[in-house]
Amino acid sequence: MTIKFLSESTINRIAAGEVIERPASVVKELVENAVDASSTKINIILERAGKNLIIISDDGIGMTDKELEIAVERHTTSKLDESDFLKIHTFGFRGEALPSIAAISKMLITSKKRGTDKAFQIKLIGGNEKQITISVHNEGTKIEIRDLFFATPARLKFLRADKTELAVTVDIVKKIALAHPEISFSLTNDSKNLLKLKGQNKDAETNLKQRIIDVIGDDFIKNAAYIDFKILDFSICGYTSIPTYNRASSEDQFLFINNRPVKDKLLQVALRVAYQDYLARDRYPLCAIFLQIDPQFVDVNVHPAKAEVRFHDPNYVRNLLIEAIKNALANKSHVTSTTIASDTLKLFKNPLINKQPTINKEVNVNSKSVDYRSYSSANTPKILQNHICQKLIDTLPHAKVEQEVENRIEHKQQIHKQYKLGAAKAQLHTTYIISQTEDSIVITDQHAAHERLGYEKIKSYIKMDELIKQRLLIPEIVELPNEKRADCLYDHREKLSKLGLTLEKFGEKSIIVTEIPNILGDVNVQKLIQDLADHLSDFSENVALMELIEHVTETYACHYSIRAGRKLSADEMNALLRQMENTPFSGQCNHGRPTYIELKLKDIERLFGR
């Protein structure tokens, strides 16, 4: 077989295979072109999720007839020249999108250059038969794509159901819209409105906040920390959720480099590391984070789809992102998710709360049996109501309340006006602390809260190298389920020694413990070592010290904390609440669950129809 040149149409179809995978790819390329054209309004119309028809119209700078003819040729662009290849600020720069799309569809472009009198139209079928005619159009450009992949029918077999393809397109438009809150976007499919976003023209922070509310939701903003981080020519801004507001997947993580939406592993790992102290490993934060970096320090020309980037100094970027997120979270470290209280109140709601009892008009006064349920309290004389209530109260068994606790609480009536978590009023099921603030009640999980306090305390001791060892009077021998777990602990013995735990191997499946961290006090050594072995069984000997510290600290904190089922005095409960108010990230446990929920008085009153 001889070597020969490929035809232009074949080259374009091959290029389309790299750039255009599905209707969403077409929408992405054309919307990005519209953004680069300084548009303020971008409208997207689809039929069958774009399989039959895609129309993108904008009010950008438009094109002349000559520019229109050149635009559909390969490697033609207005966005790049040889001198600024390392300083790319625009979405597009390859000059491949239009000819690649034209090669596999029926394309019609209508455009009018700003400041000119005439509009022009060009029609292409499979990238051929170019026809330019005079047309009528407002300033800007409209591109119609029909019968996508008609020239490459094999690609149609790989398309998913309309619903799936549409979801991908909506996600792409949302990402671009987040990066450009100053632009209005609309998206319809089969005449159904899916997105309608109004362009914002206020200051940058307000614009971004409103666009995030429109795209991600108001709940996210209410439960997010604002990021504003700058160092030299590098800046990070946006919003990231507080730990108690999380998801089971990473779908709601929006990351941008110079306003370009990216899916970069380095940034995703940095995000994960920033939350590792506050979230369980199967939970993910929500975020919309924008990194601005000098274009010469980031390469966006890694893949035709431009979803991946390469940094000149990846570790520098990673560390700055972690620092920016942690700083933002520190400013919201005592806050718990606002949705928790509303979800809790829903559980209390009585489905019969709005149903008023009706009066039985056929009551026989001579009857010995009267159905009291048929009477409305509104029809009972007040004096009788009070009499009935008093009688009822007199028959109720009084709650057993320890006089000592009651007296102590009475002396602290004003605490709820001074402190965020209020004054302790009671302990529920020896597990939850009920406290009162000026306008709410707070329910605190004593174990989760104290575990968080312990975690932060132990972590600070480790950081300051102040973790004191306590020698056991009688060394403890701990037998583990198998030799693997015993070997795992023994392999990490030097690192564990730095964390206050001294141990040696004792037989095949046993470990002998001679020293433990002093802060753990009278801890159950058997349970501590078994839990540590469970945590570390999947770790290699070469695991990083910081990662080991995280897992060991979690285990220490769990054994350090007071347990559910322990009765606390009023002083102990109030002491715990005061510690929470003065400890960072006390609003969530080590797994991202809330340590307390706050129920506003007005919401409680609403439950009773007040």
From Swiss-Prot:
A molecular-function term among this protein's GO annotations: mismatched DNA binding
UniProt keyword DNA repair present: yes
Family annotation (SUPFAM superfamilies): ATPase domain of HSP90 chaperone/DNA topoisomerase II/histidine kinase, DNA mismatch repair protein MutL, Ribosomal protein S5 domain 2-like
Stored Pfam families: DNA_mis_repair, HATPase_c_3, MutL_C
A biological-process GO annotation: mismatch repair
Gene3D superfamilies: 3.30.230.10, Histidine kinase-like ATPase, C-terminal domain (3.30.565.10), MutL, C-terminal domain, dimerisation subdomain (3.30.1540.20), MutL, C-terminal domain, regulatory subdomain (3.30.1370.100)
Assigned protein family: Belongs to the DNA mismatch repair MutL/HexB family.
Functional description taken from the UniProt entry: This protein is involved in the repair of mismatches in DNA. It is required for dam-dependent methyl-directed DNA mismatch repair. May act as a 'molecular matchmaker', a protein that promotes the formation of a stable complex between two or more DNA-binding proteins in an ATP-dependent manner without itself being part of a final effector complex.
Cited PANTHER family: DNA MISMATCH REPAIR PROTEIN MLH, PMS, MUTL, DNA MISMATCH REPAIR PROTEIN MLH1
Designated name of the protein: DNA mismatch repair protein MutL
Source organism: Rickettsia canadensis (strain McKiel)
Lineage of producing organism: Bacteria, Pseudomonadati, Pseudomonadota, Alphaproteobacteria, Rickettsiales
Gene encoding the protein: mutL
